[in-house]
Amino acid sequence: MGQYTASQRKNVRILLVGDAGVGKTSLILSLVSEEYPEEVPPRAEEITIPANVTPEQVPTSIVDFSAVEQSEDALAAEINKAHVVCIVYAVDDDDTLDRITSHWLPLVRAKCNPSLDGEGDAEAEAEGDTQREPIRKPIVLVGNKIDLIEYSTMDSVLAIMEDYPEIESCVECSAKSLHNISEMFYYAQKAVLHPTSPLYMMEEQELTSACKKSLVRIFKICDIDGDNLLNDYELNLFQRRCFNTPLQPQILDEVKAVIQKNVPDGIYNDAVTLKGFLFLHCLFIQRGRNETTWAVLRRFGYNDQLEMCQEYLRPPLKIPPGSSTELSHRGQQFLIAVFERYDRDGDGALSPEEHKMLFSTCPAAPWSYSTDIRKSCPINETTGWVTLHGWLCRWTLMTLIDVVKTMEYLAYLGFNVHENDSQLAAIHVTRERRIDLAKRQSSRSVYKCHVIGPKGSGKTGMCRGFLVEDMHKLIGKEFKTNVVNCINSVQVYGQEKHLILRDIDVRHALDPLQPQEVNCDVACLVYDSSNPRSFEYVARIYIKYYAESKIPVMIVGTKCDMDERRQDYLMQPSEFCDKYKLLPPHLFSLKTNKKELYTKLATMAAFPHLRQFGLMTEDPKLWLKAGLGVAAATMLGFIVLKTISAAGAHTR
């Protein structure tokens, strides 16, 4: 796929304005013909310079304005269409210089912001839009006719620049001698493609807060070993990622020397600190090398407004109907590396502070540490902190249910830069479910099980039991935090699979289930075996939603450590399962601390063609007829039979 860089503007439109007689038209004609025109028309026609003859390789349109031929409405339209406005004055005429501040700059501001003008301002106030940031069109001040004087107007122009932050640059030139003509249009191009104002505040002579924030994030991403320094290896990697060239040792030493000279704490242990890194970019901008800082920002996904580009955060991903999304091997390896970088004490778990630091390159953490990841994934049961296994489980969950969010956060964490590829390389799209059914085996490694049952049936305890080593700790526990999904891994015939238990919260027995609550890889219908009225709800759910579907179903009776009560229903649970050719009810209790239930659910999801397990358990030959492919050759069919048949036994 190749490296991704946020794209810059694909074309540039330059508008020249100024008082009559300052030489706007002459400048354009001199650029095109490379000689001074003897006869100058009132206005030059719009011209387009091809990309291959411009320094920035971007097609550029140059537009002339004449107050004699055009109206003020036409001027307003041209100002709004332009990407940059060149205000031209004559260096030998002080009146044209004075008119920059008395007329042209206020005019450009007003045309870009109609609300700054009388009526528009009242309208904006009525609509509550007074807080909107004014639009600042990039401006280049151009002093023409430098061949007529022996002094410079730069001191006067620099004073104007301090009052108008939208002024990107100023240049003195001559249409007659062709002095600085091409440079003038290059500065105009540069004002659009590599603007100064988003990066730097001229008056304060420091980086803008948005630029500083972006560069801090970039520094953290490049700090691979997490020591808050960029060593030679990290700087070289940064250089290659941003500019596709290595950093020569001599150049690197010179850069460090400049930083050391200007920022006492910019270098530490022969490595660049954050202060040194920020100073370096400030220096680039002060020396007119904006394109260097912009190249870095765009490589890390920033657009001209210093916001992360949507195409950088969310590359297009095609997911066929019936397919799901999982982390690829590269995605897992990257997340392991990120975890290990921020596990500063090396204890194999992320403390709340380490977790917060890890997501410091993101707008916010994608989940709550206390009420989400610690409740939905396996944790270190001694400290209550998130383990590497739990960390990967939470990413696996997010990738299945919200892959777009996964891609966004991979970008925030620097996947695109470290892997030199887009986040698509971190995502695996599984084959369609219909193909799994046809091949009689699932190729996926992540399955979703919907746990459905009446309130008080014990389904929440069953879901939470999936996450802990000792389920006895959950007995009598009141679950105050509502956790929708619980995820852990199980072994299915020697292969690691992730199983997500989604606790479907049903308030009333008669409430209909939504399609997204029904559709899953395996359904687990839970009733309280000690409550005579509990099974009826489960039976109705099965008949209404699953009897005619291809989704495998397991019926689970909880609280089997208590006296089993006869159910007030047409059939008892075992009779119901026989009738609908389901496995016998699996009896479950937290007190037994037995976890084969979760393995059986994952197995049923992995082999979706074996929907009617009740039939299969009666005749071993039917397992072979089911056609497990490789399983038949390796006696896997026998293992499946043995595993599933055990579901009929009571687990007390």
Swiss-Prot record:
Residues at which Ca(2+) 2 binds: D343, D345, D347, E354
Binding site for GTP 1: 18-25, 64-68, 144-147
Residue spans, topological domain Cytoplasmic: 1-621
Binding site for Ca(2+) 1: D223, D225, D227, E234
A Pfam short name: EF_assoc_1
CDD domains linked: Miro1, Miro2
Subunit structure: Interacts with kinesin-associated protein milt. Interacts with vimar.
Name of the featured protein: Mitochondrial Rho GTPase
Source organism (scientific name): Drosophila melanogaster
Name of the gene: Miro
